[in-house]
Amino acid sequence: MPKMKSHRGACKRFKATASGKVKRERMNGSHNLEHKNRKRTRRLHQSTLVDSTKEKQIKRMILA
């Protein structure tokens, strides 16, 4: 059986931290920002952690 390939799209969107959690960027923060308030745009530029229910799936995709 051949080796599993990592999912190239997932590798560009998610990063594994040193503690084993998975980081992601928030959506809706790249354009059309003129109608979003400053507090929201600041929050959208911060990265966050992936939910624990999806973490195992994403790790399998990026660390394969």
UniProtKB/Swiss-Prot annotation:
Pfam assignment, any one: Ribosomal_L35p
Superkingdom, taxonomy of origin: Bacteria
Biased composition (Basic and acidic residues): 25-35
Region named Disordered: 19-41
Any single GO BP term: translation
SUPFAM superfamilies referenced in this protein's UniProt entry, alphabetically: L35p-like (SSF143034)
GO CC, alphabetical: cytosolic large ribosomal subunit
Cross-referenced InterPro entries: Ribosomal_bL35 (IPR001706), Ribosomal_bL35-like (IPR021137), Ribosomal_bL35_CS (IPR018265), Ribosomal_bL35_sf (IPR037229)
Protein family according to the UniProt entry: Belongs to the bacterial ribosomal protein bL35 family.
HAMAP family in the record: Ribosomal_bL35
Protein's name in the database: Large ribosomal subunit protein bL35
The gene coding this protein: rpmI
